[in-house]
Amino acid sequence: MNTSSQGTVRKWGLALLPLALLLADLALLSAQATHPDAAWATLPFKITARLLAIAFALALWFWTQALIGSRKGGPAIGDALHDWTEPWNTHLQSRPKLANAILIVSSAFIDFFGLFLIAAGLFGPTLRPFVGLLVVFVFRQICQALCTLPIPPRMIWRNPGFPSLLVTYGVANDFFISGHTAIAVLGAIEISRLFPWPFGLAAALVAFGEALMVIVLRAHYTLDVLAAIAASFCAATFALHLCAAFGI
């Protein structure tokens, strides 16, 4: 990480202070709601706590906006996680066999999650897992039709020499949103709903690994990954209510 990146990290790190104060204040508000008879839960204390929450949120907003405004624009997409993981990417650039192995393993997990969502919807008590997958797919393809992003420099994306059922190695310009991340996160959500928590935790760790992998390989930008995580939770919630409403 260069000196400029280190300075940026320190400046953004300062934003953790108002964020921590905001979270602490929200915890106080929650405690006031669950202990309404406490001396620190009277109306004046509640109003004060709410005012502080608003103040901390505004401080966080203006501080982070100032940091964003101080950045210099450019023709390329800036990605801090690409910068921070550059040593890992460089390591894989010089070790193609290791990079291929990572591609194979990550694609195998995507095949597993995708087939699980389809099978769970087909043979399980509800069609919800498949509907969630369908919602993510439709949203992603709409984004692909409307948005085109430049290929990240030093991207590692190729056919590793082992077939995959769902991963299309021949397509190398489908960035927003990350299909790897979306399928993995949605799979982890459904596994946590259908199985005991250790299985959900294991699936969540795999999903985290998938997200990290596409960043290190430069197969996606950070914005692709973050949007995919949000889209997966939205799709899972939408599918839950939709299937419950229609009894499917």
Question: PLM features: residue spans?
Answer:
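Alpha-helical transmembrane spans of integral membrane proteins, capturing the lipid-embedded, hydrophobic core
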Residues: 19, 50-62, 108, 112, ...
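Membrane-interface helix caps and helix-loop-helix hairpins in membrane proteins
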Residues: 169-173, 215-223
